[in-house]
A protein has these predicted regions:
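N-terminal export and membrane-targeting signals
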Residues: 1-13
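C-terminal motif of bacterial Sec signal peptides marking the signal peptidase cleavage site
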Residues: 17-20
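Primary mode marks residue(s) on the alpha4-beta5-alpha5 output face of response regulator receiver
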Residues: 22-278
Length: 278
């Protein structure tokens, strides 16, 4: 995971390169793959728009549920032998992430506590010819643990719904491998902002750190200034990008953060030139 920071309004001055790269960082939403012990056939799977419990049973989305189906598809071109988890992830996750963005109404889901959850057949199911893949979206609690959700997520990110599931961090996204997600209405140091930057396609070469920074720096500084409503010296634009393995699985984005110089309680959204909250 590549991490950088720049002061909003003084982009390019005193940028410190921060080392460290991982495919998955604890405390940051990432995809989850589930190999169920049950063996449903494709005809028995829940449909797009339905909500499910832990056993893939359909439940009313107005009631507490584990996930919401955003897409159902088939693995193709993999032959009869089980291909292994990495190859399955590389085919399933890009399609599921695209379906998730369309279902939520925005590609900004990487800046939220919503995460893709992918299910596929067990080894026995694969051996009997099952090739289905089920894409669902689940929600993380502010402590980073998955929790049951009440209410549908269809088109949630089209408008004010972003704030309901926004990622906020206890520690610096620019400096910490695990910034520690937390509730946005409590003390925090940084807020993920709308305007996730898509760098390319998973089949393309992974961009270098310098290429990521060249595109992310100006983009994130602009996104943070628009989010805050002013360019300030006490709020920085931070950004985080995924590593090469995650890139091959569809994680081709950069998430921008509005990072303050000290912890605060409240929101930076629309703060303008007012004092940083206590």
């Amino acid at each position: 995971m590549r991490r950088r920071r720049a002061a909003v309004g003084v982009l390019g001055l005193s940028l410190a390169l921060l080392t460290g790269c991982t495919a998955s960082v604890a405390g940051v939403p990432d995809a989850e793959v589930v190999r169920p012990s049950i063996l449903p056939r494709a005809d028995d799977l829940p449909r797009t728009g339905q909500c499910t419990d832990g056993a893939l049973g359909v439940v009313d989305c107005a009631q507490p549920h584990e996930g919401e189906v955003v897409g159902v598809g088939q693995f193709t071109g993999m032959g009869g032998a089980h291909p292994g988890e990495r190859d399955l992830r590389r085919q399933a996750l890009p399609a599921c992430r695209a379906a998730m963005a369309g279902y939520l109404g925005s590609g900004d889901h990487d800046a939220t506590r919503l995460q893709a959850r992918v299910l596929w057949p067990s080894l026995d199911g694969w051996a009997r010819g099952d090739r289905w893949r089920l894409c669902t979206v689940v929600e993380l609690a502010p402590d980073g643990q998955r929790r049951k959700r009440t209410g549908p997520v269809k088109d949630l990110l089209k408008a004010a719904g972003f704030a309901q599931v926004q990622l906020c961090a206890q520690r610096s996204p620019a400096e910490e491998a695990d910034p520690g997600i937390t509730a946005c209405d409590g003390p925090h140091l940084a807020e993920a902002v709308p305007g996730v930057l898509d760098l390319g396609e998973p089949g393309e070469p992974t961009p270098s750190g310098e290429q990521v920074d060249a595109r992310a720096g100006e983009h994130c500084a602009t996104a943070v200034a628009g989010y805050v409503g002013a360019r300030r010296q006490d709020v920085f634009a931070s950004w985080r990008a995924f590593g090469s393995q995650a890139w091959s699985e569809g994680y081709t984005t950069v998430v921008c953060y509005a990072e303050a110089t000290r912890p605060f309680t409240g929101r930076l959204w629309g703060l303008g030139t007012q004092d940083l909250p206590a």
